[in-house]
């Protein structure tokens, strides 16, 4: 958390939408629980502005995006539609409107934000773009960084043949926000375009990071390098190895 006058700015680097260490073990929700607890800490510190770092996040589980979105939005829209998942005409019975979680489901972690700053890169995709597109129906979302990937569709995982060590994950549905908008096939163009690799790289959360620095400037009108703002608490960085794709198939290495 960074403090500038009455601005208490939360920052989260989120690199993959997974409910637990094994993305395909849906019974393990340890990551989701940790995320809820983290947002309770943000709320206890009176965070009223937020920077969400999705620059290296290529997507993941929609229900994890549902949780994150529900922790960020205004409290009075909890329970409203988040996104629409629409299948082809042969599977229209599977069409689903996914809601924002209810107040009781996000415990005490909802930040009740009026706006959100999202840091992006060229591999920001899928569930990350769902966050941007869906929250624009409820919040002022500012995008800082590079143009995103442009993945407006979702995939269904078929993992019945576990003994062979592979899964099938075809594209099966199109994703819209509640206003039926999904016009980002070419990715989201940033409101402020910045290529982080044109300057020295900094640690996540370091105010020398040009993307985070720009977000701080947008919020406060001050350059973070001209004024000291001390991050409160330890930064925690977790790594998920990249998944391999070939011809729209998700390839999972066998143990």
Residue ranges, per PLM feature:
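Long, low-complexity, repeat-rich, intrinsically disordered, solvent-exposed domains used
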Residues: 1-4
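C-terminal "post-core" interaction segments
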Residues: 9-12, 16-26, 36-37, 41-49, ...
């Amino acid at each position: 958390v960074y403090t500038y006058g009455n601005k208490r700015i939360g920052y989260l680097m989120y690199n993959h939408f997974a409910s637990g260490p094994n993305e395909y073990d849906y019974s393990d929700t340890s990551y989701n629980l940790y995320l809820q607890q983290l947002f309770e800490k943000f709320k206890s510190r009176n965070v009223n502005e937020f920077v969400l770092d999705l620059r290296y996040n290529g997507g993941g589980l929609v229900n994890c995006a549902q949780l994150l979105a529900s922790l960020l939005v205004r409290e009075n829209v909890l329970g409203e539609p988040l996104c629409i998942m629409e299948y082809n005409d042969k599977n229209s019975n599977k069409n689903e409107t996914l809601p924002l979680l209810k107040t009781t489901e996000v415990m005490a972690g909802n930040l009740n934000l009026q706006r959100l700053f999202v840091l992006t890169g060229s591999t920001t995709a899928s569930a990350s773009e769902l966050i941007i597109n869906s929250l624009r129906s409820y919040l002022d979302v500012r995008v800082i960084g590079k143009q995103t990937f442009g993945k407006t569709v979702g995939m269904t995982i078929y993992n019945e043949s576990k003994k062979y060590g592979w899964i099938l994950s075809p594209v099966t549905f199109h994703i819209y926000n509640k206003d039926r908008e999904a016009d980002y096939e070419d990715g989201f163009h940033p409101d402020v375009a910045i290529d982080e690799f044109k300057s020295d790289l900094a640690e996540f959360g370091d105010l020398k990071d040009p993307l985070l620095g720009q977000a701080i400037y947008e919020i406060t009108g001050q350059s973070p390098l001209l004024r000291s703002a001390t991050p409160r608490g330890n930064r925690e960085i977790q790594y998920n190895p990249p998944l391999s794709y070939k011809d729209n198939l998700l390839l999972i290495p066998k143990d």
